[in-house]
Amino acid sequence: MKQRSLFSVLCFFFISFGVASVSAQTCTTDKGTFRPNGTYDVNRRLILSSLPSNVTDQDGLYYNGSIGQQPNRVYAIGMCIPGSTSEDCSDCIKKESEFFLKNCPNQTEAYSWPGEPTLCYVRYSNTSFSGSADLNPRNWLTNTGDLDSNLTEFTKIWEGLMGRMISAASTAKSTPSSSDNHYSADSAVLTPLLNIYALMQCTPDLSSGDCENCLRQSAIDYQSCCSQKRGGVVMRPSCFLRWDLYTYSNAFDNLTVASPPPEPPVTVPQPAGDQDNPTNNDSKGISAGVVVAITVPTVIAILILLVLGFVLFRRRKSYQRTKTESESDISTTDSLVYDFKTIEAATNKFSTSNKLGEGGFGAVYKGKLSNGTDVAVKRLSKKSGQGTREFRNEAVLVTKLQHRNLVRLLGFCLEREEQILIYEFVHNKSLDYFLFDPEKQSQLDWTRRYKIIGGIARGILYLHQDSRLKIIHRDLKASNILLDADMNPKIADFGLATIFGVEQTQGNTNRIAGTYAYMSPEYAMHGQYSMKSDIYSFGVLVLEIISGKKNSGVYQMDETSTAGNLVTYASRLWRNKSPLELVDPTFGRNYQSNEVTRCIHIALLCVQENPEDRPMLSTIILMLTSNTITLPVPRLPGFFPRSRQLKLVSEGSESDQYTSKSSSFSS
């Protein structure tokens, strides 16, 4: 009996180690593809990265949601079987979501039923599949071993178990081994030493009839292909079936298996010469020893081969994962996901006293994380259609951008229909808070303002040219420039930002969005935007920084001149050889006139009507940092009123007072 017990234990280990992983991911190839880095890709990353927290936040560990607008809307489902811990469930869904992001590079649909550390389900698609019974594409896996027991008896027991479980799962009745979300786990005695353990799950959105049909078809398919194997799995987009001869899941921990029938007496045949001595212990010992001598080395050898194979497989998988990560240009955002409860606690439940301000897309709150870090929490408005687009852009774009003159994104939250961005907290608020407040203007002397102009220029240059992506901000304005404790500028608010292709120079849109006072003429009137439209906005910003006045105001040189905005006012002053009248009076005489004049000159070059006439950012930075470059005469700015009352200086003439006369520079 001892030898038999040893043999049973070794068989158990053989079965356990011989089973393949049940996870088989399907990146559907016949449902279309999407453009990497495009809007669908952005939406897919957002919904998959937030799926673990969204699922575990639900009492039933089931989440069905979507993000975006057609044709780039992404639908997703995540779920775990009943009894799963939140930690195991989150881990399972996170691993599978990461797999899809790395290994389904442009497929618009994929699904998987991974089994570790618990059984979970992840699916995404560009079309709604809620309530739809999808039987294809189908996958199956089998145990490597064959059945040793009577196949006819096994089939009878297996079919009885399958029928009982399909009925329990599809009728959605809660029993000790099933729940009301189309799930069932059960077992049946096969032999005194072996039980059949089976687990079934349909997606909870299916009707009872569709669930039954899906599971029954899976059972039929398995019988057709693999009925002699010791275990197997059939996976479809809408249902899952697995059975095996060992407890592969904690779902079976509380199951009570019916007691096996009494074990029949075992008769050991004796050699013919010893028939008169039925109690010959030597002969009996030799037979058992032979069995053990043959069985143990064989099983150990198989185990060694399996372990070696497993180690080699893991090494190969690790290499492939490292290679995929190193080749991917898009950083995953999973590590940046915050749960809603954390953000709610950080902002004192979005208390009014924590509110820093409010814009067109939502409110901004000051928060403090549990580790003591101060953060700025941007809670997008649920009523704003633009808010959804803003969230998608900011959450993905800003994670790719690292520059001292760009605000840093710490994370985001996409739960309970909330869209929240968590930024580093910048202590001195935004530029407009100081620039347009008569009591605070004096805190920004010319030295600080000149430093701010240079920092903004370097930040835009990074967006346009120096980052891995070519990004047009499209909403540069004083309220989107934050100031840190040392008054260093940080560009923020990437809700309208657009990624350009390597060779792309211009984009077009029918949806004009942003702040009109900073818009270039070609964008405001025709929806055309490019790097040159950002440069126009930069020029407006420079004039505001120098003057302490808003471009949206109305200004005129004297009673006889036509009123205009700050840009036209600055252009008139320039052409009438009195640009320093633009300077903020709070400076007094504490500024260098040549430095200020040069900045006004550069700003007027940036706001020229023709985009081709505006300098590139690399040229602008050279103009700001070098006095040896001769600047061209600025042409008329955009929206300039052609008034006969205005006396213009000839386009071809230059004044020594307003242009540097050293070596020429061509942009």
Swiss-Prot record:
Record: glycosylation sites: N37, N54, N64, N106, N126, N150, N254, N281
UniProt-listed CDD domains: Gnk2-like, STKc_IRAK
Disordered: annotated segments: 259-282
Species: Arabidopsis thaliana
Keyword tags: ATP-binding, Glycoprotein, Kinase, Membrane, Nucleotide-binding, Phosphoprotein, Receptor, Repeat, Serine/threonine-protein kinase, Signal, Transferase, Transmembrane, Transmembrane helix
GO CC annotations on file: membrane
Enzyme active site: D475
Domain Protein kinase positions: 350-629
Gene behind this protein: CRK11
Enzyme Commission number, as recorded: 2.7.11.-
Matching Gene3D superfamilies: Gnk2 domain, C-X8-C-X2-C motif, Phosphorylase Kinase, domain 1, Transferase(Phosphotransferase) domain 1
Designated name of the protein: Cysteine-rich receptor-like protein kinase 11
Extracellular side: 25-292
Reactions catalysed, as given in the entry: L-seryl-[protein] + ATP = O-phospho-L-seryl-[protein] + ADP + H(+); L-threonyl-[protein] + ATP = O-phospho-L-threonyl-[protein] + ADP + H(+)
